[in-house]
């Protein structure tokens, strides 16, 4: 008989790095979740842009179960068929010629930064070690990636931090140009800053970074952990902008809810990562890669990408209607199904309160800082779920505007 647990047990037993919602989800289907009490929620959070095909998708369950009935793990001393098939699918679908599999976005970014440093050291010299990143970015929680993130809140308690990392202002090419020089080995950037407020890069900004990297022989890394695998209406956001990076990192939606990450690059850059220079025990395991292969099969189609663009329009239309009623947002922005509602000054700092009130109304949303409510729903969310979920979100906005919301 399984142990009966409650939300209070989290506070008793877990390291307190999170403050989870007061309810515990126990079952999901598509874009809906149910908690221990049987209450239904429409999920516009998507596990933070992870559940690209919703919960318990039949094809993903089938892929997982089929591989689970064969074998689960061998370690990196052996390869496996699902990993090789997934690598070929990613290569065929992108600019990449080589793939490194890992378990998360942080690990993918760690690998990308290490590759960039090693490539520069091997081809030029150890002096070429500088990394330029951007303020308010998010690249993961390892010491290297959290240092690149440019959010002191996440890194200041862990000094001394890795050296030679500098931060420019996002979408400001002059700021970046002032930092990128011949000693720069890499520039790492999110095509849309997710945690930083759902801020899409301008095309001119990314094109300018490409030109600066070419001029100074630095590698351009696109962190597509949040924007990748169909989220923006293209398989990867670099395709939306027409700017090709040297290295791309992907995770989150790649596994549709099963942990996996990957670093994609060209043969030339990958060649410096010789045996023993980097590795992972679980990366590229057959369970994860079998599921991810099925995710790509479903998402990498014109029908799915066109559907994302149509659902984007539906969200924008309804969010604008909500804003006409309540006047809470100064801007509604984003690409595809990664959207952010920026709060007016009157409601500054209340994004978390809105998210809490939304959950009470039966819809799950995210925040991106204190002033932005973020949406990252499943890419196959239905029209009915969009309508019902945003009706519930409107109710939360109404309650907050009326002063009836509380932090409880």
From Swiss-Prot:
The reaction(s) catalysed by this protein are: N(2)-succinyl-L-ornithine + 2-oxoglutarate = N-succinyl-L-glutamate 5-semialdehyde + L-glutamate
Which residues carry the post-translational modification N6-(pyridoxal phosphate)lysine, per the record?
252
EC main class here is: transferase
NCBIfam families of this UniProt entry? Answer: arg_catab_astC, argD, PRK01278.1, PRK05093.1, PRK12381.1
Decide whether keyword Ubl conjugation is in the record. Answer: no
- Report the protein's function: Catalyzes the transamination of N(2)-succinylornithine and alpha-ketoglutarate into N(2)-succinylglutamate semialdehyde and glutamate. Can also act as an acetylornithine aminotransferase.
InterPro entries in UniProt: Ac/SucOrn_transaminase_bac (IPR017652), AcOrn/SuccOrn_fam (IPR004636), Aminotrans_3 (IPR005814), Aminotrans_3_PPA_site (IPR049704), Class-III_PLP-dep_AT (IPR050103), PyrdxlP-dep_Trfase (IPR015424), PyrdxlP-dep_Trfase_major (IPR015421), PyrdxlP-dep_Trfase_small (IPR015422)
Per the UniProt record, the source organism is: Salmonella dublin (strain CT_02021853)
Which Gene3D superfamilies does the entry mention? Aspartate Aminotransferase, domain 1, Type I PLP-dependent aspartate aminotransferase-like (Major domain)
The family database entries (Pfam families) matched by this protein are listed as:
Aminotran_3 (PF00202)
Keyword line? Aminotransferase, Arginine metabolism, Pyridoxal phosphate, Transferase
Q: Which cofactor does it need?
A: pyridoxal 5'-phosphate
Which CDD domains does the UniProt record give?
OAT_like
Q: Which GO terms describe its molecular function?
A: identical protein binding; pyridoxal phosphate binding; succinylornithine transaminase activity
Metabolic or biological pathway, per its Swiss-Prot or TrEMBL entry: Amino-acid degradation; L-arginine degradation via AST pathway; L-glutamate and succinate from L-arginine: step 3/5
Q: List the protein's name.
A: Succinylornithine transaminase
